[in-house]
């Protein structure tokens, strides 16, 4: 391990990998460190991503695609299922990835581009000089090394500590952390081409339950509920076990994954002098769906591009790096996060009866395409009273 790099990236998930690949392709010296002993494991993700979203960063490869989705379903609290055909999304729905293989592919590409990669390497503290970040102390194979860098990109996930160490408030309120559990199950009867979402306060309070196929008779079956709704006897696992017992009584669980997902607004600021936060560390997960793969790759790539420009200009100050923060907030992704946060806040306050009404109403709409924005617009046309309930959000998208 060298003692000096242009860019030091902490975290080997999709955000860190795209940052490393992009920076290396631009000719910068790059060090990517991952605290776990293997890239891509353990998987803490439902593994879904849209086709067009994926293609923006990497061509699809059967090696790391578990299943191709051609539709989706949303199940209301009363059991009514609304079906969404692929034609509503222009025939471009999405994939269920094999994240263990996918994440490694991204990091391999970063390494091929010239990035140095170290696993089982933890950033234990920042190196500060005159109040400015200069790098990090890395614990690697039983010893500590000081590595300096012109800029550090923190891609250290939902548990991100590095930003906090550098003075950025990364605290997430308990109510905005989803407590999540997922089983990888086999020998279950499913529609192998459709992702299914279950809503309702009896099924998943202030959250949802999902079935994401990974083959003809295999799927990720998981749940995310609000942290404030979790407690003894009503943990996320308790709700999931009840669902599995009813829906897949003869299914076999071959893996159990637990974790937390932030469904809050993004951090107030995602940069400091010589520092940028990306992906889950920046809290850019979609607050409505909990999805974060695309947002992670987008912010990782953008951060590296801005870093390269700022290094070339010799200015890594917070003011110079703010172009990254401004650009992702102004992007389609950033606007979607803000809109979906308001939708999420609206939906979690609704009783099951209201959720039933909304889903039944949507099922009757003549949707030519399906997206969150289209859905809300059509709902407002069909239910003008929602204008008052949705308030500023409704006004902003009319």
UniProtKB/Swiss-Prot annotation:
InterPro entries for this protein:
DGGGPL_reductase (IPR023590), FAD/NAD-bd_sf (IPR036188), Geranylgeranyl_Rdtase_fam (IPR011777), Geranylgeranyl_reductase (IPR050407), GGR_cat (IPR054715)
> Which pathway does this chain act in?
Membrane lipid metabolism; glycerophospholipid metabolism
Q: Which Pfam families match?
A: FAD_oxidored, GGR_cat
Keywords on this record?
Answer: FAD, Flavoprotein, Lipid biosynthesis, Lipid metabolism, Oxidoreductase, Phospholipid biosynthesis, Phospholipid metabolism
Task: Spell out the disulfide connections.
Answer: none
Record note on cofactor? Binds 1 FAD per subunit.
Record-level GO cellular component terms: membrane
Q: What is the catalytic activity of this protein? A: a 2,3-bis-O-phytanyl-sn-glycerol 1-phospholipid + 8 oxidized 2[4Fe-4S]-[ferredoxin] = a 2,3-bis-O-(geranylgeranyl)-sn-glycerol 1-phospholipid + 8 reduced 2[4Fe-4S]-[ferredoxin] + 16 H(+); 2,3-bis-O-(phytanyl)-sn-glycerol 1-phosphate + 8 oxidized 2[4Fe-4S]-[ferredoxin] = 2,3-bis-O-(geranylgeranyl)-sn-glycerol 1-phosphate + 8 reduced 2[4Fe-4S]-[ferredoxin] + 16 H(+); a 2,3-bis-O-phytanyl-sn-glycerol 1-phospholipid + 8 A = a 2,3-bis-O-(geranylgeranyl)-sn-glycerol 1-phospholipid + 8 AH2; CDP-2,3-bis-O-(geranylgeranyl)-sn-glycerol + 8 AH2 = CDP-2,3-bis-O-(phytanyl)-sn-glycerol + 8 A
| Record's keyword annotation contains Kinase | no
Instruction: Spell out the HAMAP family in the cross-references.
Output: DGGGPL_reductase
Protein name per UniProt = Digeranylgeranylglycerophospholipid reductase
Q: Which organism is it from?
A: Methanoregula boonei (strain DSM 21154 / JCM 14090 / 6A8)
